[in-house]
Amino acid sequence: MKTRTNLVSKVLFVFSFVFLGALAFTACDKKNEDKNNSNAMFTISGNASSSQVVPSVTGSGTATIAGTYNSGNGQMITTTNWTNLSGAPITGGFYMGAAGVNGALIGDLWSLGTGLTATGTFSDTTTLTSEQATALKSGNLYYSLATAANPNGEVRGQLTATPQ
């Protein structure tokens, strides 16, 4: 009887070891771990054009945005470059909204200053709330630049956040 008990104990031990090992390996998903890590870093990017403005506008202007988002402190640091706008941008900003949908402004409009032209660069630091960070990670934030000719937006581009 003692031999049978030892055999059952050994089988249960091996089964438990295999089960827990399998559970540990299947629970690890690096991509989701990075998205949910409270100190994860993300690379921000996005291309803007007049066709993405809702409703679309006529123009050959484009813009690109590049930067980082730090989920530890909520800071998104970006640099926006634009070219061929109808004139100098008078304002810009970040908005919550899916592609093709107008959304609400987050934070303040960018204070772009004076002396700008139809081609230029602007850098910004914005602190996101947890709701805005979730929208960023799911592709539901966009940026827009407005000009005197198109005060509701001349170019618009969705933001993409890629875990580093």
Where are these regions (language model features)?
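Bacterial Sec-dependent N-terminal signal peptides
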Residues: 2-5, 18-45
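Transition segment at domain starts
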Residues: 34-72
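Divalent metal-coordination and catalytic microenvironments
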Residues: 65, 92-95, 143-145
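Short, well-ordered beta-strand segments enriched in hydrophobic/aromatic residues
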Residues: 75-84
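Acidic glycine-/aspartate-rich tracts in secreted/extracellular proteins
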Residues: 84-86, 97-101, 148-150
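Extracellular C-terminal loop/segment signatures of secreted glycoproteins
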Residues: 102-112
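Short proline/glycine- and polar residue-rich coil/turn motifs
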Residues: 112-121
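Short, exposed beta-strand-loop hairpins at the edges of beta-sheets
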Residues: 133-158
